[in-house]
């Protein structure tokens, strides 16, 4: 049954959904990687598709920018459409010099300055972590594809234009691999509603060196990240 934000029916989505922030990237993923993809959502332009990858039913849908937006879609997919696993496939900014532009980062955990998980967890700190099997499958998929993926903590920021750039120094000290805006929220939603989640990000810009990819590149490239996500789903089916 349709929700206020998703005009699909039960069964339209696969049990695994890849979620980029940009709905146009979702369309690109469906057009490029899925066979027989059909549109299953277009409310507010947040495009969603379901197709098959090597015979396996998989969906892809945008989640927008920031924890409030992605939390709405993740919650509805899990509770109303039976989704069991969400893989965020997005971009992040690097804060460490040993992390390079276009590196693939697998978010084992997600720090955040958002209060949403504290709201869920009775004002205590909640360790927002990815599902271990999904992390392991993503690492194995990356190795099989010959992609060197970094695994560790990422930081989900509430503000894109931060008033406190010194926080980047703290992140670097604590070994944070990249900054994005959604993973901690998706991990929190998954934990609350009994699903599993993982964030795989490609470094789109470097906060230290000021290197960056273009908007067009972010929309239509980063194929290694998508291939890792898709192949990890197949590995999960074999477990």
Swiss-Prot record:
Q: What is its EC number?
A: 2.4.2.1
Active site at: 205 (proton donor)
Entry superkingdom: Bacteria
Q: Does the keyword DNA repair apply?
A: no
Q: Which positions bind phosphate?
A: 21, 25, 44, 88-91
Homology family: Belongs to the PNP/UDP phosphorylase family.
Any one biological process term the GO annotation gives: purine nucleoside catabolic process
Q: Name one GO molecular function term.
A: purine-nucleoside phosphorylase activity
What organism is this sequence from?
A: Erwinia tasmaniensis (strain DSM 17950 / CFBP 7177 / CIP 109463 / NCPPB 4357 / Et1/99)
Function (record text):
Catalyzes the reversible phosphorolytic breakdown of the N-glycosidic bond in the beta-(deoxy)ribonucleoside molecules, with the formation of the corresponding free purine bases and pentose-1-phosphate.
Q: Which Pfam families match?
A: PNP_UDP_1 (PF01048)
- Site Important for catalytic activity — annotated at 218
What InterPro entries does its record include? Answer: DeoD-type, Nucleoside_phosphorylase_CS, Nucleoside_phosphorylase_d, Nucleoside_phosphorylase_sf
Q: What is this protein called?
A: Purine nucleoside phosphorylase DeoD-type
């Amino acid at each position: 049954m349709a929700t206020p934000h998703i005009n699909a029916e039960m069964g339209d989505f696969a049990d695994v959904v890849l979620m980029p922030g940009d709905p146009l990237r979702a369309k690109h993923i469906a057009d490029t990687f899925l066979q027989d993809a059909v549109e299953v959502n277009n409310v507010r332009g947040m495009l969603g598709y379901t197709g098959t990858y090597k015979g396996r039913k998989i969906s892809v849908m945008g989640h927008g920018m920031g924890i409030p937006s992605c939390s709405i879609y993740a919650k509805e997919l899990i509770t109303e459409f039976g989704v069991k696993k969400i893989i965020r496939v997005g971009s992040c900014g690097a804060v460490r010099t040993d992390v390079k532009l276009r590196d693939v980062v697998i978010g084992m955990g997600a720090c955040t300055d958002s209060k949403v998980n504290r709201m869920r967890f009775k004002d205590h700190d909640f360790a927002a972590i990815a599902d271990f099997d999904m992390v392991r499958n993503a690492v194995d998929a990356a190795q099989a594809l010959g992609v060197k993926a970094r695994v560790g903590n990422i930081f989900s920021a509430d503000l894109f234009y931060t008033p406190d750039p010194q926080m980047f120094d703290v992140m670097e000290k604590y070994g944070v691999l990249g900054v994005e805006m959604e993973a901690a929220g998706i991990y929190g939603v998954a934990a609350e509603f009994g699903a599993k989640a993982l964030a795989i990000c490609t470094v789109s810009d470097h906060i230290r060196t000021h290197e960056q990819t273009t908007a067009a590149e972010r929309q239509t490239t980063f194929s290694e990240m998508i291939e890792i996500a898709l192949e990890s789903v197949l590995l999960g089916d074999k477990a």
